[in-house]
Amino acid sequence: MSIRSDEVRDKILRGARAELAQRGLAVRVEDVAATAGVSRRTVFRYFDTRDALLAAAIEDSMRSYGDHVPRPGPAADLDGWLSDALVAVHRMNAQHGRVYFELASGAARGGVLGDIARARRTARRELVQRFTDTAWRLANGTGDPPDWVKDTVAVNLSAFATEALGPDFGRHPEEVGRSLARALAHAVRGAAADAVDQGHATTPPPGAPRRRRSAK
């Protein structure tokens, strides 16, 4: 594919992403063509079907989502990293718009859109797990983080959290990210402290006599 062809394809994908954010999966090829500034025929030169176009645009969105979430550097601290990461996440949630709510609804879908919906679900689970493990490490957590911490991370990263605090409370994505970062930092630190306390409660101090098992 030539440089010119790559540019046209990228323009079509950007148009599709913008329309998906506004209209969701009900978007028409005509809408994408108008936003991209090309003809409907040009769109079909690059994508055989409407579903193939939408799937490519959503896949492009998912790839950019992961690229925008910062990874902590060697000197990173929990509060700073959570703030940067959650601001990035909620910016992306706001940009992706309506289509992500539809994909997260759990509605049965077939064909390439069904494949993309399943891929999105898998990618989200992987992101939540990676995010949880990183936050736990930065909080000096011991052992594995409890499941409720992962659940809390999932809720705080969700596009539904962006939407809940956006229109109803007039918060910008940056404000949403910073607010939820503070809440999540408290939750993760609390869980890490609980894990230490439980470890002390179950581990006898050095030199303490071991409890003998009663004879059966």
Show which residues each predicted segment covers.
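Basic, helix-initiating cap at the start of DNA-binding domains
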Residues: 1-35, 51-52, 213-214
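DNA major-groove recognition helix of helix-turn-helix
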Residues: 16, 47, 57-58
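Amphipathic alpha-helical linker/stalk segments
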Residues: 21-22, 27, 34, 55-85
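Short hydrophobic/aromatic patch on the recognition helix
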Residues: 37-47
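Helical hydrophobic small-molecule/effector-binding pocket
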Residues: 59, 80-106, 126
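Amphipathic alpha-helical packing segments from all-alpha helical-bundle domains
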Residues: 91-95, 101-102, 112-140, 147-151, ...
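Hydrophobic/aromatic-rich alpha-helical bundle segments in the mid-to-C-terminal region
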Residues: 135-183, 191-216
